[in-house]
Amino acid sequence: MGSGPRGAVSLLLLMLAPPSCPAADCPAPCSCAGTLVDCGRRGLTWASLPTSFPVHTTELVLTGNNLTALPSGLLDALPAVRTAHLGANPWRCDCRLVPLRAWLAGRPERAPYRDLRCVAPPAVRGRLLPYLAEDDVRAACAPGPLCWGALAAELALLGLGLLHALLLVLLLCRLRRLRARARARARAALRLSLTDPLVAEQDGTDES
């Protein structure tokens, strides 16, 4: 009977404890201990970063890698995460960083992330990630395929506009020439009509 209350308390604590990550769910090359996933100092980049982590992860360590951004939705898929260690990474604060900036903006505490700074591009170099406005991040975006496509479309429209303007100028010049010729012919016909009676009268005078 004496062990009954202690057994009940132990069972309750076991039920309340967060589930640990099975070894099979621990992504390579990280190491896992309980709900802690340690991927720090593994030389990870955007391309080599694991695409997913155990859903019960409460602490994620990504410190000391070569990460310039995180894939969209990576942290949002971990609702149990209380802390993500992201320091000592060369964060590039452009379009790719928008998801991470949004995730940081939604954290109740920003103090653990105040050492995160932008390394590039030059416009935002040295700025603190948690206090970076989304407009600042988007303004630093390099032109993507859509931007280049829109630019090409604008240039094509500009070229068509210039071509139409050139054709219009040529048409106006042609019309002016035709009008000038018509006026010249009209003046010549008028002169001819005025000189014909004089010639006829002169011929009649000569005959008499």
Swiss-Prot record:
One of its GO terms (biological process) is cell adhesion. Residues 27-55 form the LRRNT domain. Glycans are attached at residue 66. It is a single-pass type I membrane protein. Pfam families: LRRNT (PF01462). Residues 173-208 are cytoplasmic. Keywords: Blood coagulation, Cell adhesion, Disulfide bond, Glycoprotein, Hemostasis, Leucine-rich repeat, Membrane, Phosphoprotein, Signal, Transmembrane, Transmembrane helix. LRR repeats lie at residues 60-83. Residues 1-26 form the signal peptide. Residues 89-143 form the LRRCT domain. The modification Phosphoserine is found at residue 193. The chain crosses the membrane at residues 148-172. It is found in: Membrane. Residues 27-147 are extracellular. GO terms for cellular component: membrane. Platelet activation apparently involves disruption of the macromolecular complex of GP-Ib with the platelet glycoprotein IX (GP-IX) and dissociation of GP-Ib from the actin-binding protein. Gp-Ib, a surface membrane protein of platelets, participates in the formation of platelet plugs by binding to von Willebrand factor, which is already bound to the subendothelium. This is Platelet glycoprotein Ib beta chain. It comes from Papio cynocephalus (Yellow baboon).
